[in-house]
Amino acid sequence: MIKQVVFLKKRADITMEQFKDYYENQHSQLAKRMGAKPSLPNAQRYVRRYITPEKNPLTGEVIHPGYDCIMEIWWNTREDFEAAMKGLGNPEFLQARLEDERKIFATNGNPVCTVEEFDSPVGPNNVVPRWVSSN
């Protein structure tokens, strides 16, 4: 399993509520509206995580990370991820996607990463949570 992570910053002239509303009800559905079936081929999960800066318990400071949302997509294989990235560059859909992103994102130049996850045992029984598959 491979996870793609994208760090997103909203446009300065929209509120966080406007950002969330548009992302959830418009942008996240764009591929489907444009006729892609499925909208994210071979994706296993697609999640948006909206950021609320909190106080650092060591310093007491609230430090904004510079991004408003972390988008994550899980893929079974690197090949699935790469095929999806190639598909996103399809000229038939690229211009519409870029125009839609300009409605909510500060830039189209958002950092895109893949991550390798390791889980540690937690909780009273000191176990790795059951939803975690072994690495």
Write out the residue ranges for each language-model feature.
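Macromolecular interaction modules
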Residues: 1-135
